[in-house]
Amino acid sequence: MTSGDKETPKREDFASALRFLMGGCAREPEMTAMAPLNLPKKWARILRMSSTPKIPIVDYLEAAESGNLDDFKRLFMADNSRIALKDAKGRTAAHQAAARNRVNILRYIRDQNGDFNAKDNAGNTPLHIAVESDAYDALDYLLSIPVDTGVLNEKKQAPVHLATELNKVKSLRVMGQYRNVIDIQQGGEHGRTALHLAAIYDHEECARILITEFDACPRKPCNNGYYPIHEAAKNASSKTMEVFFQWGEQRGCTREEMISFYDSEGNVPLHSAVHGGDIKAVELCLKSGAKISTQQHDLSTPVHLACAQGAIDIVKLMFEMQPMEKRLCLSCTDVQKMTPLHCASMFDHPDIVSYLVAEGADINALDKEHRSPLLLAASRSGWKTVHLLIRLGACISVKDAAARNVLHFVIMNGGRLTDFAEQVANCQTQAQLKLLLNEKDSMGCSPLHYASRDGHIRSLENLIRLGACINLKNNNNESPLHFAARYGRYNTVRQLLDSEKGSFIINESDGAGMTPLHISSQQGHTRVVQLLLNRGALLHRDHTGRNPLQLAAMSGYTETIELLHSVHSHLLDQVDKDGNTALHLATMENKPHAISVLMSMGCKLVYNVLDMSAIDYAIYYKYPEAALAMVTHEERANEVMALRSDKHPCVTLALIASMPKVFEAVQDKCITKANCKKDSKSFYIKYSFAFLQCPFMFAKIDEKTGESITTASPIPLPALNTMVTHGRVELLAHPLSQKYLQMKWNSYGKYFHLANLLIYSIFLVFVTIYSSLMMNNIELKAGDNKTMSQYCNMGWEQLTMNLSQNPSVASQIRLDSCEERINRTTAILFCAVVIVVYILLNSMRELIQIYQQKLHYILETVNLISWVLYISALVMVTPAFQPDGGINTIHYSAASIAVFLSWFRLLLFLQRFDQVGIYVVMFLEILQTLIKVLMVFSILIIAFGLAFYILLSKIIDPQPNHLSFSNIPMSLLRTFSMMLGELDFVGTYVNTYYRDQLKVPMTSFLILSVFMILMPILLMNLLIGLAVGDIESVRRNAQLKRLAMQVVLHTELERKLPHVWLQRVDKMELIEYPNETKCKLGFCDFILRKWFSNPFTEDSSMDVISFDNNDDYINAELERQRRKLRDISRMLEQQHHLVRLIVQKMEIKTEADDVDEGISPNELRSVVGLRSAGGNRWNSPRVRNKLRAALSFNKSM
């Protein structure tokens, strides 16, 4: 058999199965021969597993496109999922059938539940494709199903939009038969309906079909507010407009009414046509009855719009077609009271201006701001229009609402005064021009003021030549020279000074008493200042008593300060009416560079009338930049730090309290290194402690009497104590502070501390020895019962052995209670005397501290521990001084407390040592947390203790474990011990349960289970978590705590030590040579370093060797870059000067030659705004208000 013969039975089986299925499906009464085949899964699997070869997708889609239904069916039944297959364009079989008008394929796809709303890559459905391909039968079939007619493609077009845009008239007619399934008012892109598209593309037939067959309404606007008739007018769609007119006439609406429809902005179609700039559309609107005098919402007519656009052809057309409306339009004004002539003048359209004036427009009409077309053209730099209007006889004396004439606007906008003057002289009179020269506006400024302000050199020169007065003052009493000085117009100033009256105006003052020299100095225009000084400007003061150098210092212009000082050095220390020097004013304005320059010049550090220095203002307003410039000055820093402060005894304490970062810079400056290699033996590090010592301490002065309120006695370690008070960890951890404490420690601290520790250790030893001897030298004395004397006379060991053998005798002894007494040996008496002497001496010291510290002493827990220790120790040693040596339970309790607290206080002593002290600090911090937590959760201990007392106190045959629940106090203690894990579950609960002695076993076990969950598990883990968290916080604050303890230690010592002796051991500076071989350590230092680790290890303190290596490198690199920038700037200035000389030599005229150097008014306003708003992060509005108030301080404050 051949391979074909082998496959024959398989094909027959497949064919018979298929015939059976087809027959069964056809026999169903509700299904036809074309009904979809709902094949069972096993038959579908048989079909897929048959040897039928796989057919490409292209063949399947080509079958749909060709309309061959048999092939399409065969391919579909081979794989039902092929109905959703798409080609490269995203088109399905339904798209292909619709494109080729294959209704049979579409009908079969519908029978197979195909998707007719599927989109291709362009977003088109089969309905879009049918419209685009003129497949009318397919279109009719799809609409009859019906399919979704509102699907939008990528261009936001529904099928009806697409048919209208492509002018598919026949397709629209087919769609009109199914208008009930089509939303004709559906919006596409920008909300445009199909009627909008017909108007835009002028498809009149489409528009007619949409109106007649679809009942489309032309009164439906798009999202932009335009009606279809506006779109037709804008796009000159005359045929479509005619359709709209006919529709309106059929409904009783005239053409004039149709052409007068307003859009959202109040535009009629004629406005839209003018906006579009198409003269045909305008002509169409005019022929349709549109009025050129129709106003939109802003009251502008189409003539206004055409004049603003410069469309003279449209203007002429409108006037020619509607001559009766011309006069009305020429005088019609918009919301700004502007006529069409204003619009044409504003946008510099001289041809339209000439035409409008020829047609009778009012050449001197005024708008809302009283501007004529001439003023409006001049304000918008329309110089062609300006000259034309002058030639046409426009009035040049008209002023606007701000009283500015045309000459003001010519100067302000950079017009050529020579051309303007020539036009006025030729067309009008020279006298009229003379009147304009010195006229003032509402601010009192003449054209010469504006020429000086804006730096128009040529205009200024022409104004002076024409006879303008150079000493006119505005409302602020400012002359043109003041304006030129304020804006840095060097050449303008020179021209004004070279004029006839130049020598008379150089020293004139404005309303604030400021001369041009004051103003130029305040604005930092160094060249202008130099020019004024060379021309003989006098050094007057303004109304606040300030000289030019003070104003330059306030603004921070260092070059101006140096120039003024080089000419008039006596200005440096002059004061204003409030007693402020230039340094005060520069500090108030936070100008660090000016402060550095002034201090380098040698300015005096004086106080103003409020008795405040410059550093006081920097501290008061919290200006770190200003303070840093003063306290880190190379030469004058010591003088600044020596000044007294208004609120603090000295500047150092004020900086620590208010500006720690600034004082950190002071500390950095106090550490200097030798100028040699760091590995050299001669390399040293010098620490200066002058600012930490605070040698300049001043008393507070009573303002009324002038006497000292407090004595100016030296305060121990004032700087370090202030750091501790304000929590300045970074300052305490600074190498200078640590080295300062190390100097104190090495000078006297370690000796006194070790001596104190040694004395306390002796007391501790005697307390321990006494307690041991007391317990070993107790004797028993019989009471009144003489029968028990034989037992009482025995020693403790013999008595214990006898009592263990005779329990009845032991109970009798307990009942009769023998008296106990101590054997007063010499050792016990000696120890008791030493203890008493120590306690008496320390009690006197504690009483002195109570007198000094008062309430603060009581709040210290350590002091309470000390008093309890002293009292318990005295009670403990009392039997040693009694004749009979009697001892009772009180003495036992006192002895136990004294021994415990004495050793506990030794632990507190160790917290001042660095290596072990940190652990003591952590222990105490966690102890505080534990006490707080236990105070809160003691509620649970009481709750469970009472519950266990009720459940376990009444056991019939109690075991020893149940005795702990016999009363409430014992039950609470037992509950607390159970919290630590001592449950004894078997003995307390299990044995009792199996002996049936638990009264309520279920309740007992329930409460026990709750207890085990809440107390040993939950509460103990909570305590551990809190402890870990507190350890982290303690580790973060350990540095401050350790250093604070050292500060407190040295402060207490210095309060008690003689001042003369302290002056002898203190050092103002310390020099270390880190590379030299260290000498042999002393015994004390060796012990401390070995066991306690000296609080100031050499390794940590030596880190300062390289603490500013990077800073030095960065500073050097920055200085090098600054020098390069200065050189580049200098070279650019030289090249700019040479280029100007070349241009002048070659007589090249440019617009730049007409503008003087300096800054523009807008730039000056922005700079002033930044200064007023705070140019840096330290100038908040609140601080700026305070600063302004400070400038006018008086003594009454």
UniProtKB/Swiss-Prot annotation:
Coiled-coil stretches: none
GO molecular function: calcium channel activity; ligand-gated monoatomic ion channel activity; monoatomic cation channel activity; temperature-gated cation channel activity
TM region(s), chain numbering: 754-774, 828-848, 857-877, 890-910, 933-953, 1005-1025
Main subcellular location of this protein, as a coarse class: membrane
Positions of ANK repeats: 89-118, 122-151, 155-184, 190-219, 224-253, 265-294, 298-327, 336-365, 369-398, 443-472, 476-505, 512-541, 544-574, 578-607
Superkingdom to which the source organism belongs: Eukaryota
Membrane topology: Multi-pass membrane protein
Intramembrane: 969-989
A GO biological process held by the record: temperature compensation of the circadian clock
Observed phenotype of the null mutant: Eliminates avoidance of elevated temperatures along a thermal gradient.
Localization (cell): Cell membrane
Keyword Cell membrane included in the entry's annotation: yes
Cytoplasmic compartment residues: 1-753, 849-856, 911-932, 1026-1197
PROSITE patterns: ANK_REP_REGION, ANK_REPEAT
Sequence ranges on the Extracellular membrane side: 775-827, 878-889, 954-968, 990-1004
Entry keyword annotation includes Transmembrane helix: yes
GO (cellular component) term, any one: cation channel complex
Alphabetical keyword list: ANK repeat, Cell membrane, Glycoprotein, Ion channel, Ion transport, Membrane, Repeat, Sensory transduction, Transmembrane, Transmembrane helix, Transport
Disulfide bond positions: none
Residues the record marks as carrying a glycan: 785, 802, 823
Cited function: Essential for thermotaxis by sensing environmental temperature. Receptor-activated non-selective cation channel involved in detection of sensations such as temperature. Involved in heat nociception by being activated by warm temperature of about 24-29 degrees Celsius.
Complex formation: Homotetramer.
Family under the similarity heading: Belongs to the transient receptor (TC 1.A.4) family.
Protein's name according to its UniProt entry: Transient receptor potential cation channel subfamily A member 1
Name of the gene encoding the protein in the UniProt record: TrpA1
